[in-house]
Amino acid sequence: MRNILPDYVLRLAEMCLRITGKPLYAVGGIVRDFLAGFPLAGSDLDLCAPLPAEEFSALAQSAGFTINAVYKRTGTVKFSVRAENAGEKTADFEFAAFRRDVYVRGEHTPTQTFFTEDIVSDAKRRDFTCNAIYYDIARDCFCDPLCGAADVKEKRLTCVDAADKVFGEDGLRLMRLARMAGTTGFTPTEDTLSGAKNNAALIADVSPERIYNELLLCLNADERYGVKGGAYAALSLLDKTRVLDYIFPELTAGRGLAQRADFHDHDVLEHSLRAAGYAEKSVRLAALLHDVGKSEAFREEGRFASHPQRGEAIARDILTRLKAPARITERVCALVKYHMYDYDLKTKENKLRRFIVEHAEIADDLLLLKQADYSACKDDLSTAPCVKRWRALTDKMKGEGVPFSLKQLAVKGDEIAPLLPSPRFVGAALRALLLHVAVHPQENTKERLLYLAPKLCAAPALETR
């Protein structure tokens, strides 16, 4: 492993051993990834030693590193160095002194920290044995106090201590378990699964922001190492441990809710998890939530017809609760609202043309969502009929020169403003012109649009646009 580490880290480790007599270890993800044969690009290089933070900080500074922060309570040092190759960016590192942590049940941050020189105690403050393998940089050897290397070899996720204790200490580990399973393809042991399920309620003690961030990592789990089906594996584990019940009770209300057998092989919840798994990265969150309105619709109406509209409102509540960015919330809600549009292929072409232009900003993602939805019905990876139709029509419209944005219209707002009763009509008039030429692209000329603008403005529909 020595040959994958930068020279300046090797020199720091050798200096640490020579001056203090204590080894400097690499630990965590980079060691696990090396032993598992995963790509190391993007792996964090976390360092640790049986050494006080202040002593390590002074040592690193004397070796030419920049000290960015020292946290005495946790024994953590954040430091950086400019790479020797001038073309490279500054490299950031984190050091942690060997320690033992004490938690209030379920909280993410330890309430007490005790420093130690015992590597076993330090290993047992971590989450899974595969993340508790130490590499002695100067001596070029591994130290494996909890037999994590065997778990890496067997692709197992085993807790560093009794599973009830590990998950009971830190509720966020419940989601980290799912993320790790998705990113690595490792399988949790039965004890690990049981401990997570027993402590699932502790996820409620974790801040919404942390839950949202971990959820995104789960949704993108297959991106890290290219493990096929990683997103679905992560979400399925959240379901299996019942953590999903506390994060998305509106979604898990679909567990066991059957759908038409001629269209679906799975209940509403499983269909949603599979849709997220089949979806492209940009629409996975929308795919997870696309049918979130079905349970409410069925409960109140005995049918699913209104689920897109109900789902939009429910998705907004969920994403607001998780404090997702407003931009993400609006986009996901729009996709949920329209994911069933033209599902039966009966929408008239002119109406569909106007819809595609009016929703051009989400049209590509809407097709991706429709495809994921279709694939998740019966695990059919062929192109969805609706997607075929929309793509063919979109190509046809592009060939005809249909404008898909106001910028592509042959007139500007200041050109039609003098022709309208009031400046307040300009925006609505431009949108009306855009929808008109979606059906009549040959009329996207300045002369024709200047003629049409006041006539469209006089139309009653414009008053409500």
Across the structure, where does each feature detected by a protein language model lie?
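Catalytic cores of the polymerase beta-like nucleotidyltransferase superfamily
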Residues: M1-R465
